[in-house]
UniProtKB/Swiss-Prot annotation:
<dbReference type="GO" id="GO:0006979">
    <property type="term" value="P:response to oxidative stress"/>
</dbReference>
<dbReference type="GO" id="GO:0045454">
    <property type="term" value="P:cell redox homeostasis"/>
</dbReference>
<dbReference type="InterPro" id="IPR000866">
    <property type="entry name" value="AhpC/TSA"/>
</dbReference>
<dbReference type="InterPro" id="IPR050217">
    <property type="entry name" value="Peroxiredoxin"/>
</dbReference>
<dbReference type="GO" id="GO:0042744">
    <property type="term" value="P:hydrogen peroxide catabolic process"/>
</dbReference>
<keyword id="KW-0575">Peroxidase</keyword>
<dbReference type="InterPro" id="IPR045020">
    <property type="entry name" value="PRX_1cys"/>
</dbReference>
<keyword id="KW-0963">Cytoplasm</keyword>
<dbReference type="Pfam" id="PF10417">
    <property type="entry name" value="1-cysPrx_C"/>
</dbReference>
<comment type="similarity">
    <text>Belongs to the peroxiredoxin family. Prx6 subfamily.</text>
</comment>
<feature type="binding site">
    <location>
        <position position="115"/>
    </location>
    <ligand>
        <name>substrate</name>
    </ligand>
</feature>
<dbReference type="GO" id="GO:0008379">
    <property type="term" value="F:thioredoxin peroxidase activity"/>
</dbReference>
<protein>
    <recommendedName>
        <fullName>Peroxiredoxin 2</fullName>
        <ecNumber>1.11.1.24</ecNumber>
    </recommendedName>
</protein>
<dbReference type="GO" id="GO:0033554">
    <property type="term" value="P:cellular response to stress"/>
</dbReference>
<keyword id="KW-0676">Redox-active center</keyword>
<dbReference type="InterPro" id="IPR013766">
    <property type="entry name" value="Thioredoxin_domain"/>
</dbReference>
<feature type="active site" description="Cysteine sulfenic acid (-SOH) intermediate">
    <location>
        <position position="40"/>
    </location>
</feature>
Length: 199
């Protein structure tokens, strides 16, 4: 985290994709253990149902597993047939596990990809990553909240407190000298010298 996202050129369910071609945009890269699995299916439906919300935030979605592109195509068709949902974003066919290894997404026991999430900023820096247990589906609301918090930081250079929601106050960085800390005394939003809330 905080490092440049490893670049890649891969085959996907929508044709070849190069990560660096997304420079200037936010990217949500997420891996799943396998096509035609119950938890993953609910996640892809959930991501699709919130796709417009991601688009409104300027976020491009990229799914990934080590299944073949033909498996992805068949799964996408199956989801459309049984749930009436058309997956709008590319799914990477990482059959040689190259991208999964670059991003440390391989489960050593099963050999499959783990349930990982990476948020990559417009400068192609990894800003957030999280791994979910294989048996636990992702919380899309929380992923969107984190994206909004990171974009708030990007625009305002402010951190966000626990349980922050859009529209709430941010936190200014702590002073790095005694003099700077003394200057804060009595300023609006100051709770103590190292904690200052800013609207």
């Amino acid at each position: 985290m905080g490092q440049k996202a490893p670049d890649f050129t891969v085959n996907t369910s929508k044709g070849p994709v190069t990560l660096s071609s997304y420079r200037g945009k936010w990217v949500l890269l997420f891996s799943h253990p396998g096509d035609f699995t119950p938890v993953c299916t609910t996640e892809f439906i959930a991501f699709t149902e919130r796709y417009k919300d991601f688009q409104a935030l300027g976020v491009e979605l990229l799914g990934l597993s080590i299944d073949s592109v033909y498996s992805h195509i068949a799964w996408i068709r199956d989801i459309k047939e049984h749930f009436g949902i058309e997956i709008p974003f590319p799914i990477i066919a990482d059959i040689d596990k190259e991208v999964a290894r670059q991003y440390n997404l391989i489960d050593e026991k099963s050999g499959a990809t783990v349930r990982g999430v990476f948020i990559i900023d417009p400068n192609q820096i990894v800003r957030w990553m999280i791994y979910y247990p294989a048996e636990t589906g992702r919380n899309i609301d929380e992923i969107i909240r984190v994206i909004k918090a990171l974009q708030f930081n990007w625009e305002r250079k402010l951190a966000t407190p626990a349980n922050w929601q859009p529209g709430q106050e941010g936190i200014e960085g702590a002073p790095s000298t005694v003099d700077a800390s003394l200057k804060r005394d009595g300023e609006p939003g100051v709770k103590t010298w190292y904690l200052k809330f800013v609207k």
